[in-house]
């Protein structure tokens, strides 16, 4: 799950009509609230703003909404013109100006670098390792899983870079391994119940871009087979837009 989630959990309820006129934050909490993307719940990355309602999101987070014929704002559900989505330059500038303490090591980091810092902070990794074990909300006759696979972060199959979420993995591979001819195992597919950890994709980058445009965790029932899961995920993803 998003590592910045605990910092900005209430952000989707407290965004102003437009982030283009953000007031100067007075505390770390207000920084976290004002600069948290309502979709991924992490600090903004390449923020963009919807012209009609002014709501701001990470550019990559908003992309799926731009692929449908009648897009709706993910926050207020108002229709908007995809041609009137612009880079939130003022927000981007402030991300490089303001600092907030890391919730792991307390080091003050500019918000523009917060994602990278959290992904490599030993204290944060230690906290994540000590997260409570899975416990059902209500009593159940079903067996409690003892080893739930990590489907939140992945390792680059080319260079071994760790702690990459799905979007970060795609971005990392496109920027660093675009011309790598090696056949590699898709770490996202191999984490699925139906995945084959020994199958190597002949064109991994094309596979990433076409097969992993959405997050399986959001839409998929892992008890069904791969094709049914893919079709269900696509249908639900489109219906939410």
Swiss-Prot record:
CDD domains: RING-HC_RNF166. Its EC number is 2.3.2.27. Zn(2+) binds at residues 102, 105, 117, 121. It is an enzyme of class 2 (transferase). GO terms for biological process: protein polyubiquitination; ubiquitin-dependent protein catabolic process. It comes from Xenopus laevis (African clawed frog). Pathway: Protein modification; protein ubiquitination. Residues 225-241 form the UIM domain. A zinc finger (RING-type) spans 37-77. This is E3 ubiquitin-protein ligase RNF166.
């Amino acid at each position: 799950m998003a590592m910045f989630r605990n910092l900005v959990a209430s952000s989707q309820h407290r965004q102003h009509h437009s982030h283009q006129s953000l007031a100067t934050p007075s505390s770390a909490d207000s920084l976290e609230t004002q600069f948290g993307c309502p979709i991924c719940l992490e600090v903004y990355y390449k923020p963009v703003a919807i012209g009609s309602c002014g709501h701001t999101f990470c550019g990559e987070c908003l992309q799926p909404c731009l692929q449908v014929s009648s897009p709706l704002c993910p926050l207020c559900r108002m229709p908007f013109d995809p041609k009137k989505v612009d880079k939130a330059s003022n927000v981007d500038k402030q991300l490089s100006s303001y600092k907030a303490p890391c919730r792991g090591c307390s080091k003050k980091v500019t918000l523009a670098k917060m994602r990278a810092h959290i992904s490599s902070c030993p204290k944060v990794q230690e906290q994540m390792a000590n997260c409570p074990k899975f416990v059902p909300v209500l009593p159940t006759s079903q067996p409690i899983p003892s080893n739930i696979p990590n489907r939140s972060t992945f390792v680059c199959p080319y260079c071994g870079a760790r702690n990459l979420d799905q979007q970060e993995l795609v971005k990392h591979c496109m920027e660093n391994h675009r011309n790598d001819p090696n056949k590699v195992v898709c770490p996202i597919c191999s984490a699925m119940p139906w995945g084959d950890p020994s199958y190597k994709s002949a064109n991994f980058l094309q596979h990433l871009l076409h097969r992993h445009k959405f997050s399986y965790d959001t839409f998929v029932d892992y008890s069904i087979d791969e094709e049914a899961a893919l079709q269900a995920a696509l249908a639900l993803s489109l219906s939410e837009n």
